[in-house]
A protein has these predicted regions:
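Iron-sulfur-associated redox domains of electron-transfer enzymes in respiratory
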Residues: 1-161, 169-178
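Ferredoxin-type iron-sulfur electron-transfer modules in oxidoreductases and energy-metabolism complexes
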Residues: 139-159, 174-271
Length: 271
């Protein structure tokens, strides 16, 4: 797939101001990079899993007239869908070069949408053969088999490990508030480790309602190995069942929490 991606970037970059992708650096490190025409595309790489949506957002804000491309996995594309709805990226100025993740990669992430949907974008292509949805995270079913008291004990045991490094917030493509409630002393006491249970993580979870696109970066970067995606998978499921909305799925679908109750009717059988 890497050869196909490089070849397509080499062709499309003639029409664009640059393409955001991962670059293999001379010291062996990998970092986001804005490839321009004439750059050495042999340095373009697809691994490791790295979120690029925030990089595109920053570049579009810095260069509002530029037309950029992005080499995007399904999770990147879903993140960009939600960011577009909240005016963090301009979909009209973005060319999406999607790549379909393998069944193995999808399984590692429990990914329900392992390839971008090109139909959602003004200009897009997908390289690779899309695979079926991966099985869901088994920890979710295990959690749902617990009693309420067991669930509380589960989260207490997990959140007590939190060192408040803000890694989950910093990596999240849907966290872009200029003033973060997680840094407000009114809600989160400074210098307290672990943060008060359950305020810190429930504030973030509340803000991610109808936003979380299951990229799982929050869990991957957590130095304490807190299974955050159990919480967010449950949020995504409830929003889907209650409001018929799946974050990151449809570019034109309005986020339910931005609508009135008349426009976003809660399913009566669940009320």
């Amino acid at each position: 797939m890497i050869d196909q991606v490089r070849a397509h970037v080499a062709e499309k970059i003639k029409e664009l101001d640059g393409v955001v992708a991962l670059r293999q650096m001379g010291d062996g490190a990998v970092a986001p990079y804005l490839f321009r025409q004439g750059d050495n595309l042999s340095q373009l790489t697809l691994e490791p899993l790295y979120p690029l949506a925030l990089t595109v957002s920053l570049l579009q804000k810095q260069f509002p007239q530029a037309r950029l491309g992005i080499v995007a996995r399904g999770c990147d594309a879903r993140a960009l869908v939600e960011m577009s709805k909240r005016e963090q990226v301009d979909a009209e100025r973005l060319y999406l070069l999607g790549m379909a993740c393998s069944a193995e990669k999808a399984g590692q992430c429990y990914c329900a949408d392992p390839a971008p949907d090109p139909a959602q974008w003004p200009a897009a292509i997908v390289i690779g053969e899309p695979v079926a949805s991966a099985p869901p995270n088994p920890m979710v079913a295990e959690y749902e088999g617990m009693s309420l008291e067991e669930r509380r004990a589960f989260w207490q045991a997990q959140f007590i490990k939190c060192v408040k490094c803000y890694g989950c917030r910093n990596i999240c493509p849907e966290c872009f508030c200029e003033a973060c409630a997680l840094e407000d002393p009114l809600w989160v006491e400074p210098g307290l480790l672990a943060p008060d249970f359950p305020m810190f993580h429930l504030i973030k979870a509340m803000h991610m309602t109808s936003r979380c696109v299951a990229c799982r970066q929050c869990e991957l970067v957590c130095p304490a190995d807190i299974p955050l995606t159990v919480l967010y998978d449950l949020l995504r499921r409830d929003i889907g069942e209650l409001m018929g909305y799946t974050p990151g799925l449809v570019l034109e679908a309005a986020p339910p929490l931005s609508l009135t109750l008349e426009d976003a009717t809660i399913k009566s059988e669940l009320v």
